Regions:
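Short glycine/proline-enriched loop/turn "hinge" motifs that connect secondary-structure elements
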Residues: 85-86, 128, 173-179, 245-250, ...
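Phosphate-handling active-site elements
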Residues: 87, 97-99, 119-135, 213-224, ...
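Acidic-glycine-rich active-site phosphate/pyrophosphate-binding loop
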Residues: 83-97, 174-185, 321-322
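Metal-dependent amide/peptide-bond hydrolase catalytic core
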Residues: 5, 12, 49, 183-392
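Acidic/His- and Gly-rich active-site-bordering loop/insert found
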Residues: 2-101, 128-130, 350, 360
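Short helix-capping segments at alpha-helix termini
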Residues: 44, 126-130, 280-286
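Acidic/histidine-rich catalytic neighborhood of metal-dependent amide-processing enzymes
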Residues: 109-181, 391-392
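Residue-level signal for inorganic ion chemistry
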Residues: 17, 21, 41, 166, ...
């Protein structure tokens, strides 16, 4: 790394961010970590401001201005995390062990945010005035509603390209699937378990629906393929019904995670489930079910849209060039990954966007979430080179 910034800076910054809990069970969630990032950027000479998203929940927007002659680049990273749940170690200690930094959010994705900030300061402290601006959007809420990056786009911030720093293990993603969470509520009729014929068992009806979806819809999804993101997929994530063994279940819910391709849309996704429900209703007059879009996943106005690949965009070419030179081989193009805020930036912000960041996706949300310290150091260099090449 350039002498303008040391390796210790990015490691220490990552540790500081991990030590500040910012998940949904924390009061005001990301407010404390946002304040830390704001003060850190301001202290180190970046232009910085808050975006008030909801109550005390704020995005942090930091800028390293250029000469106004080159392309502008967004570094986007989310500052919320999933809760620690039952981790294998203290989730907010941010200790370093066997070459890894440990803790909730280190990999997904406070490490990347630290790398982005450090890269901006690296360029600033080297005295390199680039042609274009570098804009950090440290956003709230990606793990649920993505209200932070939705607010960024609605605020009018734009650029010629964007990097979303989700972990990519020295590869990159040009596209990913859209995301929709659906809840299907099945209605039955309660009765005593000794006389079940007087009731309508909602769990049995749910089982019938699941079998029909597996038989009719899932094979169709496997046939839908996209060069940059793999097949269309779905998952039954939760089923819950009934009250006790001695009663016929009068209700049952099924929650579905649906990952859809650019050739699909939310309306079509819902219709495919509704068509199966309607088919069962014609066979079984006692079958009652309705589909609900889950509130915990609904954005304000936007959908969790796909990241539509733009392989010929300047940002895609720059990321490819920098990664190839850094690892001295062809970088892997990831195709089967989770949803990211890149979908919002590309679909609604109309900004060509690429996903690449330190760490490995397999450690995100994991009981042993960790990130290689060397990845943090290396990605400061990678982000620095991407910015210098793209914004020159």
């Amino acid at each position: 790394m350039s002498e303008a910034f040391s390796a210790n800076d990015v490691v220490k910054l990552t540790q500081d961010l991990v030590k500040i809990p910012s998940h949904k069970f924390v009061e005001n969630r990301e407010s404390e970590v946002a304040e830390f990032i704001y003060n850190y950027c301001k202290k180190n000479g970046l232009e910085v401001e808050y975006q008030q998203v909801e109550g005390l929940r704020r995005n942090v927007i930091a800028k390293l201005k250029g000469k106004g002659t080159g392309k502008n680049l967004i570094f986007n990273g989310h500052i919320d995390t999933v809760p620690p749940y039952e981790m294998e170690f203290e989730p907010f200690s941010a200790e370093i062990k066997d070459g890894y930094l440990l803790g909730r959010g280190c990999n997904d994705m406070k490490g990347a945010v630290a790398c982005m900030i450090t890269a901006m300061l690296n360029i600033k402290n080297k005295g390199n005035l680039l042609g274009g601006d570098i804009i950090l959007t440290a956003a709230v809420g990606e793990e649920e509603k993505s209200d932070g990056t939705e607010f960024v786009v609605k605020s009018g911030i734009t650029a010629d390209g964007a990097i979303v720093g989700e972990p990519a293990n020295y590869g990159y993603a040009l596209g990913h699937r859209g995301l929709e969470w659906l809840e299907i509520r099945i209605e039955g009729k309660i009765a005593h378990g000794g006389i079940p014929e007087l009731g309508i068992n909602a769990i049995s009806k749910a089982a019938k629906l699941i079998r029909r979806i597996e038989e009719q819809l899932m094979p169709k999804l496997k046939e839908r393929q996209n060069e940059w993101m793999g097949p269309s997929v779905m998952n039954f994530g939760l089923i819950k019904g009934g009250t006790q063994p001695s009663s016929v279940a009068d209700s049952c819910i099924i929650q579905i995670d649906r990952r859809y391709l650019p050739v699909e849309n939310v309306e079509g996704v819902i219709k495919e489930y509704q068509d199966i429900i309607d088919e069962i209703k014609t066979e079984d007059p006692e079958f009652k079910a309705e589909i609900i879009r889950m509130d915990s996943n609904l954005m304000d106005e936007f959908d969790h849209a796909p990241l539509i690949a733009q392989p010929d965009s300047d940002i895609a070419k720059t990321v490819y060039k920098v990664l190839k030179e850094f690892i001295n081989k062809e970088p892997n193009i990831e195709k089967r990954r989770g949803w990211t805020d890149a979908g919002v930036l590309s679909t609604y912000g109309k900004i060509p966007t690429v996903v690449t960041g330190p760490g490995d996706l397999k450690y995100s949300h994991a009981k042993n979430e960790k990130i290689p310290v060397v990845d943090l150091v290396n990605y400061v260099e990678i982000y620095t080179k991407i910015a210098e090449e793209f914004c020159k």
